[in-house]
Amino acid sequence: MDVNPTLLFLKVPVQNAISTTFPYTGDPPYSHGTGTGYTMDTVNRTHQYSEKGKWTTNTETGAPQLNPIDGPLPEDNEPSGYAQTDCVLEAMAFLENSHPGIFENSCLETMEIVQQTRVDKLTQGRQTYDWTLNRNQPAATALANTIEIFRSNGLTANESGRLIDFLKDVMESMDKEEMEITTHFHRKRRVRDNMTKKMVTQRTIGKKKQRLNKKSYLIRALTLNTMTKDAERGKLKRRAIATPGMQIRGFVYFVETLARSICEKLEQSGLPVGGNEKKAKLANVVRKMMTNSQDTELSFTITGDNTKWNENQNPRMFLAMITYITRNQPEWFRNVLSIAPIMFSNKMARLGKGYMFESKSMKLRTQIPAEMLANIDLKYFNELTKKKIEKIRPLLIDGTASLSPGMMMGMFNMLSTVLGVSILNLGQKRYTKTTYWWDGLQSSDDFALIVNAPNHEGIQAGVDRFYRTCKLVGINMSKKKSYINRTGTFEFTSFFYRYGFVANFSMELPSFGVSGINESADMSIGVTVIKNNMINNDLGPATAQMALQLFIKDYRYTYRCHRGDTQIQTRRSFELKKLWEQTRSKAGLLVSDGGPNLYNIRNLHIPEVCLKWELMDEDYQGRLCNPLNPFVSHKEIESVNNAVVMPAHGPAKSMEYDAVATTHSWIPKRNRSILNTSQRGILEDEQMYQKCCNLFEKFFPSSSYRRPVGISSMVEAMVSRARIDARIDFESGRIKKEEFAEIMKICSTIEELRRQK
């Protein structure tokens, strides 16, 4: 029988059909090769938007810099970065006027945080530009390298462990005439392989000392490394994103802390909250506008899009904002916060790996590193690339491009949101002093604008005024990409609003399925995703039950763990059948051991091991939860773990799931091939760092300590902790006298070794 699909929707309100429009099946596009071209695009575009500004030269680095601030007022609709300082300051003043005490209170909160933050805050985050090796590294390694080099250059304030003291070292390092660094270099040599007796090229890595003069060091300290943003859907071209080095990160963190504190107090800000909390906050603004537009007023909403938000923002503007926000605060605090925007006004963009050339006839490939672009003959490049390189050449120093205007992606999300909200705030009737007024929502570069007025002309006038006000602070609303609708239907940060936010369940589809971490985590993540979608995304009970059955099926195929009594043959079925036959209580077997599935939509919150524990045979319990099992490389699992789930749109989300450590919580071993490459030294550093941290955690399990505040080193802290614990254990009879004596002896030996060092 043929079914007319439109009949399915007869009874469905149109907003509930949004999940059927899901466009994102299949994998998102990833970038390959070099990001140099995208970075040059960014640099050239940013300068083009500010081209009528003033050129100056940085006296320290010799970098040419373009300053568009207080430049010409716009005469057309082209995007531009000519923000007017007095307009930004006035917007800030009005914002404070509408929210008395907001800046004062946020400054006090931030000041407290600044004094308490530990330097290990900077180990969060993924890839970070490591200025010592001139490439990206995991954040923890980059920080360790920076601190190590600071100390060897006599900068020791960081030893207190406070972030603010580390930043003092950063400031001092910029005044030094030279910095001595340890860097890696590659050696290739031909050796005879013992086994095959053939000649092979062996790559080794060496460490060497290198002196950087003030200019070279400053360039590195101000460098943002660039990469291509991956997995961006709905875009034809890739684009570049930046990762700053350790010198900049700490300062940015404090500025963002202040801005976050302000955003929390602004009802129009879509940051820093997320999920349902964000929806509730936004729904309030819409409700306010709709209630106020009684029968006499029209209300329209613009689903807004800004042209190149961060390329038209300017760090000098952020400096003006911070100067205003902190105007009554202590000098030290104002200085700390103004350094990030100053560093960004002098930033350098690293052009990445450079270009790869290959000659088909000669079967040759060669890489042109970014450092060579300044003086290579352009005849090798195609027209498009030629133009890019010609344009960027005046800005190049040592393979980095001077990029004073613009912000690079994702650096000051909170602070730029404050700027956006300050313009939305100007829409109150008491400020517009006319019949139209506006309000809206802002989340980084995304906005929704709600305009109320007695008639259509008023709406048009309100939109125009908003548009022009934005231009004055370097925000360019795109007339092509924004669209206007009667209030009640709009989109904001991928939330669709139609008389309330619509649950767009299809956006979560990519996160359903088996993650591929290990049997234990995958089961837990799978059921948690279903549970969360029942709570947050209108996933109904019948659909959830079906999702669960599909998940279990998927899981069994992934790990080849079909039920012990099944006919399906896989390479595990022989073992699983044997286990099934030996087991008295078959319901107690985990799904990954060929057991039945006991999950239904009522018990998704219980980890599988707990769900089946009472049903398990005793010897199975003993095998399953056996920390001494030699075949499992065990990690100690906290009661809650974090998984990264990918929605179809927007950033990867972190999701908590319950983790019960069993012999199924294995961790795959690291690929051995890395050990023969140049990365080996780095890997060893990383492992040593990891070992130290793990050891420290053993002495101070997170439940029992507040992070040590004080100047003792990690070793001193552990030794004193060991002595205290040993004494308590000895006095309560948990350890014998000999053991106590041995512990004390080891502690003394460690201290002695430290003194000799």
UniProtKB/Swiss-Prot annotation:
InterPro entries: RNA-dir_pol_NSvirus, RNA_pol_PB1_influenza. Residues 55-64 have a biased composition (Polar residues). Its main location: host cell. The keyword Nucleotidyltransferase applies. The keyword Nucleotidyltransferase applies. A motif (Nuclear localization signal) lies at residues 187-195, 203-216. Phosphorylated by host PRKCA. GO terms for biological process: DNA-templated transcription; symbiont-mediated suppression of host gene expression; symbiont-mediated suppression of host mRNA transcription via inhibition of RNA polymerase II activity; viral RNA genome replication; viral transcription. Its EC number is 2.7.7.48. It catalyses: RNA(n) + a ribonucleoside 5'-triphosphate = RNA(n+1) + diphosphate. RNA-dependent RNA polymerase which is responsible for replication and transcription of virus RNA segments. The transcription of viral mRNAs occurs by a unique mechanism called cap-snatching. 5' methylated caps of cellular mRNAs are cleaved after 10-13 nucleotides by PA. In turn, these short capped RNAs are used as primers by PB1 for transcription of viral mRNAs. During virus replication, PB1 initiates RNA synthesis and copy vRNA into complementary RNA (cRNA) which in turn serves as a template for the production of more vRNAs. Influenza RNA polymerase is composed of three subunits: PB1, PB2 and PA. Interacts (via N-terminus) with PA (via C-terminus). Interacts (via C-terminus) with PB2 (via N-terminus); this interaction is essential for transcription initiation. Belongs to the influenza viruses polymerase PB1 family. This is RNA-directed RNA polymerase catalytic subunit. It comes from Influenza A virus (strain A/Goose/Guangxi/345/2005 H5N1 genotype G). The lineage of its organism: Viruses, Riboviria, Orthornavirae, Negarnaviricota, Polyploviricotina.
